[in-house]
């Protein structure tokens, strides 16, 4: 009988071979390269991988040689575009090397496999083990579910767009995919914010013994996280559309944020989208973590003497959870920084009147796809970070992935009982400590 490790190894090899075949198939189909989207509409230069933070920056096309306006069709119907002035043509084409495409495809497949296995295992651990169903772990489960949505939707679409570029999935999927992508990153960001706040609340009420089960406030937090994430993703579903144009005599269909929005709000959203994504989906979790971890540190220093005497073991567990949450936020910042950096650079450095602007766009397009891979890596690296930082999650992953005969509950039952006894003894000792202080002070 084959071991699980050998079966997983063979499955991984088969997936890598399939990825290589996908790369060759995408090149042989004759679709335009990834940079072709930049010349769409004749009046726009766009990077359009529909990622969690996919963006569109309006400007005049660098690849159009004609001064006549391009004909754009929406949903198969022709729509006239008013004549506009065009900047000088680029001195070179925007291109991505085939080597980068193959490397990107292999990395995406690896991230896809690791992310599916890691986040599914994490959700299974929290679902199967009652002792793991507490407030912080339920928020981590919400984070893992958001990451799983991102992996399933985002990585295959981005890989296909890099290799084939044409959008064959129809207008409905064109609106649904960016909506799900933006909702998933909203779940990730707000879950990290809630975890940071939860760690401060745990330290501020440090004498409270952590129980098993989901607190009502945590359940309310999770509902709010998902509702707010879905609401903030609605403009993506409204703004994205199928855009069809001619590219070197061939029809090219692309799913992108429509440059000609119908309402004033959507026009404002299109203009301010990059800064909105950077501020809310990147800076907000970092700022909240910095504020509440600073407050938590001050609280721990203020109560240091009593905590060391009475609740030493309890304090160690809460410090471990706080360290785990901080590690998750740090990984999030490192993984998402390249993607936001590439788009902020385009906003600040791009000059449509510069004939050398396409060299900058070639560099930013590669940096954009590197950032997309790094953002996807964040979705698969969270379970790995939990494995490395948290002893409890490490034991859970070993028990679940290695299929040990002894279940996690059996291995942890004695530890849980001992921990509860220690907590009760510490509570009793702390009460005596407070009583002695009260009588001595009186």
Swiss-Prot record:
One of its GO terms (molecular function) is endothelin receptor activity. Residues 27-101, 164-175, 244-271, 351-362 are extracellular. Residues 50-65 have a biased composition (Polar residues). Residues 50-84 are annotated as: Disordered. It is found in: Cell membrane. Non-specific receptor for endothelin 1, 2, and 3. Mediates its action by association with G proteins that activate a phosphatidylinositol-calcium second messenger system. Essential component in the normal development of two neuronal crest-derived cell lineages. Belongs to the G-protein coupled receptor 1 family. Endothelin receptor subfamily. EDNRB sub-subfamily. This is Endothelin receptor type B. The lineage of its organism: Eukaryota, Metazoa, Chordata, Craniata, Vertebrata. The gene is Ednrb.
């Amino acid at each position: 009988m084959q071991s699980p490790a050998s079966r997983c190894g063979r499955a991984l090899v088969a997936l890598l071979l399939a990825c290589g075949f996908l790369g060759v198939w995408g090149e042989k189909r004759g679709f335009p390269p990834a940079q072709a989207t930049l010349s769409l509409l004749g009046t726009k230069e766009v990077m359009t991988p529909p990622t969690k933070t996919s963006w569109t920056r309006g400007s005049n096309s660098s690849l159009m040689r004609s001064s006549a306006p391009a004909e754009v069709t929406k949903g198969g119907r022709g729509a006239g575009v008013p004549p506009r002035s065009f900047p000088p043509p680029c001195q070179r084409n925007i291109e991505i090397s085939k080597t980068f495409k193959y490397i990107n495809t292999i990395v995406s497949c690896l991230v896809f496999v690791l992310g599916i296995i890691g986040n599914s295992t994490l959700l299974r651990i929290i679902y199967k083990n009652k002792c793991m169903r507490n407030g912080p772990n339920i928020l981590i489960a919400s984070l893992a579910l958001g990451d799983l949505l991102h992996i399933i939707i985002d990585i295959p679409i981005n890989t296909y767009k890099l290799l084939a570029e044409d959008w064959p999935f129809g207008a409905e999927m064109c609106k649904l995919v960016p909506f799900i992508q933006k909702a998933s990153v909203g779940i990730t960001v707000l879950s990290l914010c809630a975890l940071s706040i939860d760690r401060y609340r745990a330290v501020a009420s440090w004498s409270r013994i952590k129980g098993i089960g989901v607190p009502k406030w945590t359940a309310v937090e999770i509902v709010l996280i998902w509702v707010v994430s879905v609401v903030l993703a609605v403009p993506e579903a409204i703004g994205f559309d199928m855009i069809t144009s001619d590219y070197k005599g061939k029809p090219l269909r692309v799913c992108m944020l429509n440059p000609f929005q119908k309402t004033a709000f959507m026009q404002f959203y299109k203009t301010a989208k990059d800064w909105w994504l950077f501020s809310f989906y990147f800076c907000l979790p970092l700022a909240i973590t910095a504020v509440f971890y600073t407050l938590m540190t001050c609280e721990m220093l203020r109560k240091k003497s009593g905590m060391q005497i009475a609740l030493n073991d309890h304090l160690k567990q809460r410090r471990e959870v706080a360290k785990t949450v901080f590690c998750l936020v740090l990984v999030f910042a490192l993984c998402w920084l390249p993607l936001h950096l590439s788009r902020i650079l385009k906003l600040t450095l791009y000059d449509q009147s510069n004939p050398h602007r396409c060299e900058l766009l070639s560099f930013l397009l590669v940096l954009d796809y590197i950032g997309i891979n790094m953002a996807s890596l964040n979705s698969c690296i969270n379970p790995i970070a939990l494995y490395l930082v948290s002893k409890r999650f490490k034991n859970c992953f070993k028990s679940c992935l290695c299929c040990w005969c002894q279940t996690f509950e059996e291995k942890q039952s004695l530890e849980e009982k001992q921990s509860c006894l220690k907590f009760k003894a510490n509570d009793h000792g702390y009460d005596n400590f407070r009583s002695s202080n009260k009588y001595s002070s009186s």
